């Protein structure tokens, strides 16, 4: 009997589950917000908490432990330089899981998992993208007007000749 045996199996063998969780943790640290299923979000929560706690220690040994778990050096740098200082005075509870509904294909429950305090950063990224998109649309509109003016000038020039 497996009474009170903890952990999430997620329908995978040990190596696959470990790789999945490492990838999810790395993605969350880099992106600060990801969408996944609720069981995966719940399974990765303790791993992210441990990584942030390592980041708060800030010594070489902690950096090496984090580098051994995380998939990219970019994630390690962001963990130690950006994320951990944000939670300097907080003892745990660094994440928020927000349920977003069910997946149409198989009915799996989806959720966003995000670092607390990342709302401002995500909003800044969204505003920056919107500004870039608006600038690109304006440039395209000006280029189209210039093309239309040039085509109109060519057609009026042909009728005079």
Swiss-Prot record:
Q: Which InterPro entries match?
A: Ribosomal_bL17 (IPR000456), Ribosomal_bL17_CS (IPR047859), Ribosomal_bL17_sf (IPR036373)
Q: Key word Zinc present in the record?
A: no
Q: What keywords does the record list, in alphabetical order?
A: Ribonucleoprotein, Ribosomal protein
One Pfam entry name: Ribosomal_L17
Q: Where is the region Disordered?
A: 132-161
Query: What SUPFAM superfamilies does this protein map onto?
Result: Prokaryotic ribosomal protein L17
Q: Name one GO cellular component term.
A: cytosolic large ribosomal subunit
- Subunit record text: Part of the 50S ribosomal subunit. Contacts protein L32.
Please give the name of this protein: Large ribosomal subunit protein bL17
**Encoded by which gene?**
rplQ
């Amino acid at each position: 009997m497996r009474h009170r045996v903890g952990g999430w199996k997620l329908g995978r063998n040990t190596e696959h589950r470990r790789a999945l969780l490492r990838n999810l943790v790395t993605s969350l640290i880099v992106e600060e917000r990801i969408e996944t299923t609720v069981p995966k979000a719940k399974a990765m929560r303790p791993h992210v908490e441990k990584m942030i706690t390592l980041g708060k220690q800030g010594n070489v040994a902690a950096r090496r432990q984090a580098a051994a778990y995380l998939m990219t050096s970019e994630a390690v740098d962001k963990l130690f330089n950006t994320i951990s200082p944000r939670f300097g005075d907080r003892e745990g509870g660094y994440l928020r899981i927000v349920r977003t509904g069910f997946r149409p294909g198989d009915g799996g429950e989806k959720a966003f998992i995000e670092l607390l305090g990342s709302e401002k950063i995500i909003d800044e990224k969204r505003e920056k993208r919107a500004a870039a998109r608006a600038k690109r649309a304006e440039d395209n509109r000006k280029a189209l007007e210039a093309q239309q003016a040039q085509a109109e000038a060519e057609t009026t020039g042909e009728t005079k000749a």
